[in-house]
Amino acid sequence: MISEAVLDELQKIVTSPFVFTDQETLLNYSHDQTEDLSFPPQVVVKPESAQEISDILKLANHHKIPVTPIGARTGLSGGALSIFGGIGLSLERLNKIIEIDEKNLQVTVEPAVITQVLQEAVLEKGLFY
């Protein structure tokens, strides 16, 4: 069980409304598209920066709390399920295109960038993804 003290620390790292303990949210983050598997985390946290992720991981490590990174929950292998409970680390707010390097044909993106958004951004530069 995650203590109130840890929840308070999470609230300091990622301010409301991005720390969730309500049953509806936990249920929504308990599954992906894998049939018949449901493992709710004890808390869902939605950071918006690498620093917030680092601080969450430091806190979780200090208290030996498992952390499961969660994306769009469209996977078919159960890889993003919180089978040990703990913290569900939703990456959905990390959705920015950091850089489009036209010379080297590379992009740097955050993990939740939507493919169509990326395709449209590079198309504006005459590129294709």
Question: Which residue stretches match the model-derived regions?
Answer:
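A short, glycine/Asx- and small/polar-enriched loop/turn
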Residues: L37-F39, L81-G86
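N-terminal glycine-rich flavin-associated loop
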Residues: L10, E35-V67, L91-Y129
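Short glycine/serine/threonine-rich phosphate/pyrophosphate-binding segments
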Residues: I53, L76-S77
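Short acidic, glycine/serine/threonine-rich loops at helix termini
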Residues: G78-I83, Q119-A121
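Short, acidic (Asp/Glu-rich) active-site segment that either coordinates a divalent metal cofactor
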Residues: S77, G88-L91
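N-terminal accessory segments
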Residues: M1-Q33, H62-I65
